Amino acid sequence: MYGTNLLETMGKPTAGHLGMAVTFTPKAYRELHEKYAAPFTNRALLQQQDILRVHVDKLITALRAKARNKESVNMGEWSPHTQPDTYTTFDIIGDICFAEPFGCLDGGESNEWARAIINIFKAATWDQAIRRVAGTGTLLHKALVKIIIPAEAAQWRTIHFSNSKAKTLARLADPDRQHPDLIKHILDSEDSRAALSPTEIILNMVLFISAGSETTANTMTGWTYFMLRHPEARARATAEVRAAFASPRDIKWETVRALPYLNATLEEALRLFSPAPSNQPRVVPACGAVVAGCPLPSGTTVSVAPWAAVFSARNFADPERFAPERWLDEGGADPRYAADRRGASQPFSTGPRGCMGKNLAYFELRLVLAHLLWHFDLEPTDSAAGRECMRRWEQTDMDTYQTWMKPDLWVDLKEAQR
């Protein structure tokens, strides 16, 4: 809970514009949300299914080569040559935003922009604290950013903004290109085209690229860790996927949503390893509010710590246990978790300001995870380094900067035998 001057200090625009991340008045946020919402609907995602499949196929091809060469794969932190989760989500978000991927999966090596993304969250954590004191776009804000944000993180942030700007302007200059990307939706909407300036579009593309890649990659890696740690859950999810699909071409949005146990493992991974573990603040409206019996004046900011919510025994039975069964309904429900308050787990936040990319994230995650289990048997790498990585994933000493600074996670893959 914070003071009551947040609207005054954080609601000031930069060059006359605000991105969605720092738009605080409900009316302004609602207007922006409406202009960008179309590409994230289920209907739009179905049109983008072929885009996602291209990148998933590239991922599987790269992993198959590793499996055949008996090479371990790092599914975790940045690695010079193997960061499959991040490569996949980064290429997908590039294709969905700008009509062209960033080439990570094609090259198999980390490019400059991909390396920048994790540092965006480090810089943003510092910037969020600065804005609470100095406002947005003020002279004091700019001065404190230069003084306080670590130089390396600030440099990567500049690279991210510069690249996002260049890609956005290039796509806006090519309105006739027929590709169901986000900017195409804006160009095809007369209302959005008239209402959004290039500066506003750039500011939000900066957000979409970072929020739409690293957070989803974190979830994939976190899910992989839990499946490695719990072989019985891994075996059950694998059996479900392979029984459901005779061919990988059958793995589609419509069908993968109907796999109850795979989806339960995903929900449980999202609960225990939320892609956005930091608090998501909300502002008390003009009429005031009462929270947990405490009267709060207008303008007060409040938030709930996701970690506290999901690890509270008030909300979940045996909260530290990875138990996909707690998410199953009739036919597979476990009575031990019947009283769980599932709504306490909100990995994409909730309400009008909930993550507008939620549908896309679920689409990517289900598609990639189903393909991974259909094609490969997964095992933790049996080496000193592999065991140390598994220990570090116990989250007792893992840093967060709005998202997790995930350690390496070494995995051995074996092609499924049929």
Swiss-Prot record:
Keywords: Heme, Iron, Metal-binding, Monooxygenase, Oxidoreductase, Virulence. Heme binds at residue 355. Its EC number is 1.-.-.-. The keyword Nucleotidyltransferase does not apply. Pfam families: p450. It is an enzyme of class 1 (oxidoreductase). GO terms for biological process: abscisic acid biosynthetic process. PANTHER family: CYTOCHROME P450 (PTHR24305), CYTOCHROME P450 MONOOXYGENASE ASQL-RELATED (PTHR24305:SF210). This is Cytochrome P450 monooxygenase ABA2.
